[in-house]
């Protein structure tokens, strides 16, 4: 089964307490994200890439502005191309909450022709939600790794998990995913 991992928005502004839009506890999932990304056959890492005057800043504080430290991914979430000579990580920048707003994503998914998508990152009820439900539209197996996501609103996250299961998605754990590799 061809599997592609989706590392959603694990950027400095979200995952560290000093970040502009810190998700509480996100730094604690970084070691597992690092392990998943390291062992993934292929990982697509989405990244917010906002301009200084991005309309999203009417809803959320300034974060992940292009060229700032906060927009970068923590080094531990990047795969090491030097080991194999080729990268197994595709960075997909986006200016909106939904990664499917990137014109690169749909053609990329068609090209990759995966059977299974494994999703993790931040924020569970926002960008992870958009990615997971968008991937369900591909009629492939889509799994959210529940111990490797973090929410701003736990109630909304649990509601999202329920809707995701009802829509045909699966919930899994990092131990199960890692054991399957």
Q: What are the language-model segments listed below?
A:
Residues 1-93, 141, 152-153, 157-181:
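Active-site acidic carboxylates
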């Amino acid at each position: 089964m061809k599997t592609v991992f989706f590392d959603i928005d694990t950027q400095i502004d979200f995952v560290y307490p000093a970040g502009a839009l810190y998700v509480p506890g996100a730094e604690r999932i970084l070691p597992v994200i690092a392990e998943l990304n390291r062992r993934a056959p292929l990982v697509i890492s989405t990244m917010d890439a906002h301009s200084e005057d991005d309309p999203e800043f009417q809803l959320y504080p300034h974060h992940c502005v292009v060229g700032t430290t906060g927009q970068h991914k923590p080094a531990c979430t990047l795969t090491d191309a030097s080991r194999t000579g080729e990268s197994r990580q595709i960075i997909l920048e986006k200016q909106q909450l939904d990664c499917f707003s990137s014109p690169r994503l749909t053609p990329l998914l068609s090209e990759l022709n995966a059977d299974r998508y494994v999703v993790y990152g931040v924020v569970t009820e926002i960008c992870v939600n958009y990615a997971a439900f968008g991937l369900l539209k591909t009629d492939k197996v889509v799994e959210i790794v529940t111990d490797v996501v973090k929410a701003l609103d736990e109630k909304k996250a649990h509601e999202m998990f329920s809707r995701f299961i009802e829509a045909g998605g699966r919930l899994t754990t990092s131990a199960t995913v890692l054991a399957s590799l």
